[in-house]
């Protein structure tokens, strides 16, 4: 079930691919002669301080896109770089009578000026093509430092730390891109300190020109090795120089994060050639490296998060790269605890499954010279690619198309008696800090309740070597939990109950297609046959399938809904959370071994008096009112109420989204970070 490469929603168009490739050759050719030796002693031996108590949380932040040229009151057509002309002629949608000052305007007048004249706001402009002003960068990192510096165990940071190249008058340069990345590194270190494991990955706008990156060693890989010297382990330096990917043990001997260079798999990168087996293509070599990493971590009984910039949507990866990534995601399901990506700016999740890879394999066999973007899809969303010319971040019609196709894909999943969880991997795509919609940031929580200082063998998953057959595994989904009449959205109507019964008994159309006989040479390379030949590691007892040590438990998404208020500094607020209310506000928090997913004071309508004993009846009534408002506000940000983020929980959520219209409407709203769009 595929949401093919939806990054086309917001991907930068290569206006003149050949000329950009020519330009790139001056920047990205391998260094001739001997490669200048970097002082690898500057690189950090990246390890978490074992004495630092685990909090069971981590941050995922992506697509910051800081723009030092951003000007408040500038026009959108100038990339938010130039104000309207004094004669009333403007590069933007509307012109002002003159460049009037705004220092003497009150808040309401200033808000009206910006809104009515359709100009760039002080804190950024939601639902626009403009990048992040430094004011937005500053309030973001100030908030992270204040609220999360001592409340997370590590940071996942999935790229794009330079502005888009949308203003021909101020073209980007390699120096500006590197300086922009250095600046964000400095903000990260200021917010979290040098003892915090921070795992960055390279984005398609972190290079010049955007999208295209050749294999290293190159000036780009060497520069990023220096820029990220505080984050890359010294033993990973030589691999990073060649490929710009690495791994970090964020909890030594227990949990690792792998930073992937997805640009080697990205089909907009014209300097690479996919992931052909037994080739020296940089994408293939990265896949080989990734498999070795996963195998090594598995042998050590560790768990792994896979992180990168461009998500593995079928339409944005070279076909053979998509197949190889899906192959590894499923074959190492008991080792990979989750997949985190950015790039898209649209909040969503999707699945890679065996049938999806099977359909992809059928398509690729029709032509050896075409990528999936040129082939008709059997299923899943196919979104229009942006045409040449000005980059358009919005693509709001494309976002709606994505919504429709995700709904179709989720609705075609087989019923609980048919679906096998071992055949599924879940991809999570986070929203961006850049206000394509409202800015978004995620705080995940993961299970540390089974002994914080030593995940003993009784609780932690050690990676059994047993290979279980379909009929032996018995991993059918538990029955769907239907919402009660007093649930978040109320009961289901009669039609929706009929839909549930239908889905319990049957699957989507592509699951009914018989698979080829693996004994025939013509079928030996098909995914379902490959899985029978290669070692495949899955287990119901693994953290990706059962809530145990290191399992992902949920996340809370914060956003900036007040960013369009011009003079008042906006505050990060909870947009939604995947948890149940009782998980966020347990009846006896002092008795829980797992820290709260979100500090209570960050929840909406929090008041400390709620959790103190009233002194008299008058105070008791006031506390009761505050308590009722608090719980109502918390319920409003808990639309999903998932017990955890294991694969089975994601599958159940996908079912419920398509079976309940109000719940899907909420999901569609959250995809756009609760931003009202046309």
UniProtKB/Swiss-Prot annotation:
<dbReference type="InterPro" id="IPR029052">
    <property type="entry name" value="Metallo-depent_PP-like"/>
</dbReference>
<dbReference type="GO" id="GO:0000298">
    <property type="term" value="F:endopolyphosphatase activity"/>
</dbReference>
<feature type="compositionally biased region" description="Basic and acidic residues">
    <location>
        <begin position="87"/>
        <end position="103"/>
    </location>
</feature>
<keyword id="KW-0378">Hydrolase</keyword>
<feature type="region of interest" description="Disordered">
    <location>
        <begin position="504"/>
        <end position="547"/>
    </location>
</feature>
<feature type="compositionally biased region" description="Basic residues">
    <location>
        <begin position="529"/>
        <end position="543"/>
    </location>
</feature>
<dbReference type="GO" id="GO:0006798">
    <property type="term" value="P:polyphosphate catabolic process"/>
</dbReference>
<feature type="glycosylation site" description="N-linked (GlcNAc...) asparagine">
    <location>
        <position position="616"/>
    </location>
</feature>
<feature type="glycosylation site" description="N-linked (GlcNAc...) asparagine">
    <location>
        <position position="369"/>
    </location>
</feature>
<keyword id="KW-1133">Transmembrane helix</keyword>
<keyword id="KW-0735">Signal-anchor</keyword>
<dbReference type="GO" id="GO:0005774">
    <property type="term" value="C:vacuolar membrane"/>
</dbReference>
<feature type="topological domain" description="Vacuolar">
    <location>
        <begin position="24"/>
        <end position="678"/>
    </location>
</feature>
<feature type="transmembrane region" description="Helical; Signal-anchor for type II membrane protein">
    <location>
        <begin position="3"/>
        <end position="23"/>
    </location>
</feature>
<feature type="glycosylation site" description="N-linked (GlcNAc...) asparagine">
    <location>
        <position position="447"/>
    </location>
</feature>
<comment type="function">
    <text>Catalyzes the hydrolysis of inorganic polyphosphate (polyP) chains of many hundreds of phosphate residues into shorter lengths.</text>
</comment>
<dbReference type="InterPro" id="IPR041805">
    <property type="entry name" value="ASMase/PPN1_MPP"/>
</dbReference>
<dbReference type="GO" id="GO:0004309">
    <property type="term" value="F:exopolyphosphatase activity"/>
</dbReference>
<comment type="similarity">
    <text>Belongs to the endopolyphosphatase PPN1 family.</text>
</comment>
<feature type="topological domain" description="Cytoplasmic">
    <location>
        <begin position="1"/>
        <end position="2"/>
    </location>
</feature>
<protein>
    <recommendedName>
        <fullName>Endopolyphosphatase</fullName>
        <ecNumber>3.6.1.10</ecNumber>
    </recommendedName>
</protein>
<keyword id="KW-0812">Transmembrane</keyword>
<dbReference type="InterPro" id="IPR012358">
    <property type="entry name" value="EndopolyPtase_N1"/>
</dbReference>
<feature type="region of interest" description="Disordered">
    <location>
        <begin position="70"/>
        <end position="109"/>
    </location>
</feature>
<keyword id="KW-0325">Glycoprotein</keyword>
<keyword id="KW-0472">Membrane</keyword>
<keyword id="KW-0926">Vacuole</keyword>
<feature type="glycosylation site" description="N-linked (GlcNAc...) asparagine">
    <location>
        <position position="138"/>
    </location>
</feature>
<feature type="glycosylation site" description="N-linked (GlcNAc...) asparagine">
    <location>
        <position position="591"/>
    </location>
</feature>
<dbReference type="GO" id="GO:0000324">
    <property type="term" value="C:fungal-type vacuole"/>
</dbReference>
């Amino acid at each position: 079930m595929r949401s093919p490469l939806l990054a086309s929603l917001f991907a930068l168009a290569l206006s003149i691919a050949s000329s950009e490739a020519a330009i790139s050759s001056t920047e990205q050719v391998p260094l001739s002669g001997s490669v200048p030796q970097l002082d690898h002693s500057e690189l950090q031996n990246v390890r978490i301080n074992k004495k630092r108590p685990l909090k069971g949380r981590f941050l995922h932040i992506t697509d910051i896109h800081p723009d030092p040229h951003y000007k408040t009151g500038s026009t959108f057509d100038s990339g938010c770089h130039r104000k309207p002309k004094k004669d009333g002629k403007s590069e933007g949608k509307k012109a002002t009578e003159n460049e009037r000052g705004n220092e003497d305007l009150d808040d309401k007048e200033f808000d009206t000026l910006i809104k009515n004249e359709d100009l760039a706001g002080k804190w950024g402009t939601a639902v626009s093509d403009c990048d992040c002003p430094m004011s937005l960068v500053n309030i973001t990192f100030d908030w992270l430092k204040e609220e999360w510096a001592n409340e997370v165990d590590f940071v996942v940071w999935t790229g794009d730390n330079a502005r888009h190249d949308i203003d021909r008058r101020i073209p980007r340069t390699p120096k500006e891109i590197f300086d922009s990345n250095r600046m964000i590194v400095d903000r990260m270190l200021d917010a979290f300190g040098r003892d915090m494991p921070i795992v960055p990955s390279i984005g398609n706008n972190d290079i010049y020109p955007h999208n295209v990156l050749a294999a290293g060693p190159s000036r780009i890989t060497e520069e990023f090795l220096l820029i990220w010297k505080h984050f890359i382990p010294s033993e990973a330096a030589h691999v990073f120089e060649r490929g710009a990917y690495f791994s970090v043990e964020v909890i030594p001997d227990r949990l690792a994060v792998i930073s992937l260079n997805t640009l080697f798999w990205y089909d907009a990168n014209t300097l690479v050639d996919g992931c052909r087996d037994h080739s020296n293509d940089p994408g293939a070599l990265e896949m080989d490296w990734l498999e070795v990493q996963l195998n090594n971590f598995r042998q050590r009984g560790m768990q792994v998060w896979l992180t990168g910039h461009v998500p593995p949507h079928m339409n944005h990866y070279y076909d053979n790269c998509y197949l190889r990534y899906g192959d590894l995601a499923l074959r190492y399901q008991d080792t990979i605890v989750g997949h985190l990506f950015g790039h898209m700016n649209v909040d969503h999740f999707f699945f890679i499954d065996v049938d999806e890879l099977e359909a992809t394999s059928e398509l690729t066999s029709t032509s050896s010279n075409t990528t999936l973007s040129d082939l008709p899809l059997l299923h899943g969303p196919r979104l229009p690619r942006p045409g040449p010319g000005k980059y358009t971040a919005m693509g709001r019609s494309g976002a709606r198309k994505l919504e429709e196709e995700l709904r179709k894909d989720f609705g075609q999943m087989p019923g609980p008696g048919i679906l096998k969880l071992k055949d599924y991997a879940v991809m999570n795509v986070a929203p961006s800090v850049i206000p394509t919609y409202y800015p978004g940031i995620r705080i995940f929580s993961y299970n540390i309740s089974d002994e914080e200082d030593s995940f003993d063998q009784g609780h932690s998953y050690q990676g059994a070597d047993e290979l279980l057959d379909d009929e032996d595994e018995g991993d059918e989904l538990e029955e769907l939990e239907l919402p009660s009449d007093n649930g978040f959205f109320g009961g289901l109507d009669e039609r929706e109950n009929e839909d549930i019964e239908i889905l319990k008994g049957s699957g989507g159309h592509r699951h009914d297609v018989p698979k080829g006989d693996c004994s025939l040479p013509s079928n030996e390379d098909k995914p379902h046959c490959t899985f029978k030949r290669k070692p495949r590691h899955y287990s119901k007892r693994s953290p990706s399938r059962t809530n145990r040590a290191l399992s992902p438990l949920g996340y809370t998404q914060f956003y900036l809904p007040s960013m369009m208020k011009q003079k008042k500094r906006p505050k990060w607020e909870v947009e939604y959370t995947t948890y149940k209310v009782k998980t966020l506000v347990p009846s006896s928090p002092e008795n829980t071994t797992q820290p709260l997913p979100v500090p209570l004071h960050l929840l909406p309508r929090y008041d400390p008096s709620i959790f103190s004993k009233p002194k008299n009846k008058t105070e008791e009534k006031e506390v009761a009112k505050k308590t009722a408002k608090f719980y109502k506000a918390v319920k409003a940000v808990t639309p999903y109420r998932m017990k955890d983020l294991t694969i089975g929980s994601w599958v159940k959520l996908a079912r419920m989204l398509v079976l309940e219209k109000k719940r899907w409407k909420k999901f569609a709203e959250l995809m756009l970070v609760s931003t009202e769009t046309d």
